[in-house]
Structures are given as structure tokens and as C-alpha cells.
């Protein structure tokens, strides 16, 4: 009980600070606690698949971790845990947002953000960014609701691009070796195709020569009979 009283006192002190400096965070702080207390023990029977966009309650976390209620893209499902990339609103005041990766408009960016343009995704009312370096492992119980039209097809080039960048950020050495082997495989495949093409051309020439030889031999046999 003593530890609980200390925690309540600390939270109350923080709430008083936020009340005077950041009322919005205080409200989200409270909503997070309420959601946790209501849903902590509730069973979840959702069927969740990769590529789906949900509204999540990420809870209270340290900066720069994503906190409170935000959208998130599910990129993996393991038992009752989801692997989620948080989504937040695009803010031109932030250099990282302005330099966010986009497969068409900014394909060389090494930013930790991926630009999702509202003109390209039906579930967005305004431009947003995926936070690529803050993948979250969360319970199904953190889901508040599914975003209307919230889906990025895992077979699409955009989703596969997102997945590849995330893979490279979290497993750089493995990703580097994978890309190296992929490039080598492409080189060898191209070389094999070239050799097969040359082989086919050589076989066609050989067949033509055989026909020519057969024709000459036939003519020679005819002349020898005169």
C-alpha cells in the first residue's frame, strides 16, 4: 500500500504540472489510464491481419517513444501480440517529417519516417507519417477500433517497401548481406540467361550447318551417279 500511495502522489504531482502547462496531455494521460483499467482483464477475440490500420492506445511512455492514442499499421501477428508501426500526423515544422521517405517523391531519404499522403490512402484525412524506428509489440487489448478503409495490401509495392525499410533498420547487417546476395543472384541469373541465349544461337547454327552438310552430301551423291 505504501508504494501505491507513493505512486498516486507522484502521478498527482505530475497532473498538477500538466494542468498548468499541457492540458491536452493531461487529458490523454487520463484517457490512457481509464482505457487500461477498463480493458486490462478483458479477453480479446479479434482476427487481425497484416496491413490493417487500427486506432491503438499505446499508453504512457518515455520520449521519444510513441504514447497515448494513435493509429498504427499492423506488420506482424504472433499469438496474442501484434507488431505495429505507429502513425502520427505530418507536421512541416519537423525536419524529419519534411524529409520523410516516399517511394516517388523522396526515394533516397534515410529518414525514420515514411510519408503517407492523404491523396494516396483512403483512411487518411490529412498527410501522416509512419514511425519506422519505433516498432511496438502490443496486446490485442490495446486496440480501440479499426480505421474505416484502414488497409494497406501486404502484396502492394508500398507495403513491401515499408517492410523492407523496417527490416533494414532493425537488422542492418543481415539486410546488407541479403541485398548483397540478391544482387549476386540477379547477376548470375542474367549471366545464365545470356549463356542460355548463346547456347540456343549456337545450337541453331549447328542445326543449320548439319542441314547444309546433309544437302551437300546429297548433291555429291547425285553427281557421283552420273
Residue map of PLM features:
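Compact nucleic-acid interaction/catalytic patches
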Residues: 65-118
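Structured loops at beta-to-helix junctions and adjacent beta-edge loops in soluble globular domains
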Residues: 57, 87, 133-135
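Short alpha-helix capping/helix-loop boundary micro-motifs
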Residues: 37-43
Amino acid at each position: 500500500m505504501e508504494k501505491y500511495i507513493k505512486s498516486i502522489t507522484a502521478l498527482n504531482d505530475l497532473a498538477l504540472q500538466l494542468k498548468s502547462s499541457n492540458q491536452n496531455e493531461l487529458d490523454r494521460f487520463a484517457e490512457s489510464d481509464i482505457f487500461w483499467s477498463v480493458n486490462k482483464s478483458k479477453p480479446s477475440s479479434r482476427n487481425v491481419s497484416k496491413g490493417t490500420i487500427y486506432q491503438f492506445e499505446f499508453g504512457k511512455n518515455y520520449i521519444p517513444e510513441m504514447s497515448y492514442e494513435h493509429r498504427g499499421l499492423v506488420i506482424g501477428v504472433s499469438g496474442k501480440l501484434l507488431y505495429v508501426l505507429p502513425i502520427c500526423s505530418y507536421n512541416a515544422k519537423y525536419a524529419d517529417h519534411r524529409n520523410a521517405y516516399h517511394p516517388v517523391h523522396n526515394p533516397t531519404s534515410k529518414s525514420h519516417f515514411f510519408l503517407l499522403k492523404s491523396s494516396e490512402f483512403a483512411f487518411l484525412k490529412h498527410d501522416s507519417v509512419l514511425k519506422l524506428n519505433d516498432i511496438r509489440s502490443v496486446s490485442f487489448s490495446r486496440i480501440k477500433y479499426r480505421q474505416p478503409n484502414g488497409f494497406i495490401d501486404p502484396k502492394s509495392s508500398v507495403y513491401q517497401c515499408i517492410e523492407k525499410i523496417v527490416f533494414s533498420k532493425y537488422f542492418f547487417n543481415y539486410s546488407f548481406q541479403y541485398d548483397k546476395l540478391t544482387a549476386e543472384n540477379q547477376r548470375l541469373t542474367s549471366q545464365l540467361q545470356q549463356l542460355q541465349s548463346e547456347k540456343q544461337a549456337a545450337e541453331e547454327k549447328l542445326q543449320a550447318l548439319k542441314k547444309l552438310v546433309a544437302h551437300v552430301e546429297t548433291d555429291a551423291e547425285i553427281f557421283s551417279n552420273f
